[in-house]
Each structure stands twice: as C-alpha cells, then as structure tokens.
Amino acid sequence: MTAQILDGKATAAAIKSDLTVRVAALKAQGITPGLGTLLVGDDPGSRWYVNGKHRDCAQVGIGSIQRELPDTATQEEIEEVVRELNANPECTGYIVQLPLPKGIDTNRVLELMDPEKDADGLHPMSLGRLVLNETGPLPCTPQGVVQLLRAHGVEINGAHVVVVGRGVTIGRSIPLLLTRKSENATVTQCHTGTRDLSSHLRQADIIVAAAGVQHLIKPEDVKPGAAVLDVGVSRDADGKIVGDVHPGVREVAAWVAPNPGGVGPMTRAQLLVNVVEAAERAAAEAADAAAAG
C-alpha cells in the first residue's frame, strides 16, 4: 500500500476560489475585507511568512495593511500599533507575527488585540468561544486539518484521533474542534512525555503529528489504513526543515498529509477565511442595525 496524498495546495486553491466570490459580493456592498500584519524586526523567516500572506490576499481581492517596526521597538510602540489596527476600519482581521523580540510581553500584546479582528483564532476570547461552542474565528491550523480531511472524504465522525503535541497553535486547540458535534471524533491527546506513545498511535484512525520532533511517527506506529497528518516542524543536522512523520509511513497509511505541501497551505487559506468571515459578520451586523434603526 502506498498512501494517497492529502493535497493541501489543491484544497487551499479551491477555498481561495470560493473566497474570491465572497469577497466580490462584499465589495458590491461597499465593503473590502482587509488583512493587517504587524512585523517587528527583520527575521527572514517571519518576513517570508508575512509576504506570503499578503500574496494570498492579492489572489482573492483582500486588502493588505502592513505595519512594520524595528527590532528595537518598545512594548509601548508595539501596543500603539495594535491599538491603531484595532481602530482601523480597513482592517477586518490581523495578525501579530511571532516571535516578538526578547523583552516584549507577548501575551500582553496579544490580549490587547480586538478579538473580533483575531485572524489567527488564538486570542483568549476566541479560544474561550470555541470551548463554549460559540461563533468566532477558528484556529487556522486545526481548522485547516479538518477541512483537508473533509475535502478528501476521510471520515472524521466517530473516528479515533490521536494528537501528538501540546502547543496552543495546534496540540491544545485541535481537540476542541474535533470533539464538537459537527466533527464528532474521539480524541486522545499525547505529547513527548507520553509513556508508550506507540501503543496509542497504533489505535488511531487519524494521527495529527505536531510535536516538532524529527520522524517521531514511524511506520511501525501506524495502523494500516490510517490517515496521518504531519504538522510538526524541526531541523535536521544540516539545518533542513523536516517533519514529525517518517517517510516510511507512506507504505502503511492510506492517507498522508506531507510536510511541506499538506497542512501548511490550508493554514494560510484559513487565515483568509477568518478575515472574510469577520467582514461578513460586520456587514450583517450593520445591516441589522440599519433595519432596526
């Protein structure tokens, strides 16, 4: 058996095509969704990510609002830009590119963001809404995983999903999505401190690997026919980016989301979805207010 690929690039392209139509409909109402980014410093990797997000915006008609500060920026200077983006009507959603320079209170910066403009879906208010099953921005990578599985017909309803990782971006937040009634999965959360990790993995219908440990998931850990999504990022001895899933897993699993090319494009697409949905919610609220007035 050679696994079929969960193609994030093609699935993300389909999402962008749908967003293009939705953005055009908003523009017809006089509303242009806008993605804001705050980049502090000149880290090449961070700049590459930010530039990629704005290229995605251009593809679907979303406006770009770019804010940059030097790595010498103070806490107060960074917070001033956050307040400006909160108040900017052209910005319907934004992100603060992480990591921020040493000495900056990152949590304080993120908590200052307007939750209604939380494009990453990781503001404490957004995560709280997810716990309470209320409408709000969804965490981009977990939602990207769900959409990627659905697009390829991988059954989530009733599936046993093993998540490996405990970071807020993926590990802690994806069980919240997968256990909603709309997904209806049973989730076991593991991490690098889990005893006998392999015994948990071998029971999984779906594995989401997000520990950041090179080739942590090996072929002998995977149940034949399972779906395996590689979301982990680390570097080998040569500095090359590698994932959490050993290449040999493709000979056991039915489906594999590779890294790169699997979940990554879906994360970027979901960021755009959050920006557009924020604009749609604002438009609906404005229409309701006008009707009531």
From Swiss-Prot:
A biological process term (GO) from this entry: methionine biosynthetic process
Q: How does it assemble?
A: Homodimer.
Listed pathway(s): One-carbon metabolism; tetrahydrofolate interconversion
Which chemical reaction does it catalyze?
A: (6R)-5,10-methylene-5,6,7,8-tetrahydrofolate + NADP(+) = (6R)-5,10-methenyltetrahydrofolate + NADPH; (6R)-5,10-methenyltetrahydrofolate + H2O = (6R)-10-formyltetrahydrofolate + H(+)
Pfam families from the UniProt entry: THF_DHG_CYH, THF_DHG_CYH_C
Instruction: Summarize the protein's role.
Output: Catalyzes the oxidation of 5,10-methylenetetrahydrofolate to 5,10-methenyltetrahydrofolate and then the hydrolysis of 5,10-methenyltetrahydrofolate to 10-formyltetrahydrofolate.
CDD domains the UniProt entry points to: NAD_bind_m-THF_DH_Cyclohyd
For this UniProt record, the keywords arranged alphabetically read as follows: Amino-acid biosynthesis, Histidine biosynthesis, Hydrolase, Methionine biosynthesis, Multifunctional enzyme, NADP, One-carbon metabolism, Oxidoreductase, Purine biosynthesis
Binding residue positions for NADP(+): G165, R166, G167, T192, V233
Which PANTHER family does the entry link to?
A: C-1-TETRAHYDROFOLATE SYNTHASE, CYTOPLASMIC (PTHR48099:SF5), C-1-TETRAHYDROFOLATE SYNTHASE, CYTOPLASMIC-RELATED (PTHR48099)
* Protein name, entry field: Bifunctional protein FolD
Quote the EC number.
Answer: 1.5.1.5, 3.5.4.9
Q: Name one GO cellular component term.
A: cytosol
Q: Which InterPro entries match?
A: Aminoacid_DH-like_N_sf (IPR046346), NAD(P)-bd_dom_sf (IPR036291), THF_DH/CycHdrlase (IPR000672), THF_DH/CycHdrlase_cat_dom (IPR020630), THF_DH/CycHdrlase_NAD-bd_dom (IPR020631)
For this UniProt entry, the molecular function terms from Gene Ontology, in alphabetical order, are:
methenyltetrahydrofolate cyclohydrolase activity; methylenetetrahydrofolate dehydrogenase (NADP+) activity
Q: Which family does it belong to?
A: Belongs to the tetrahydrofolate dehydrogenase/cyclohydrolase family.
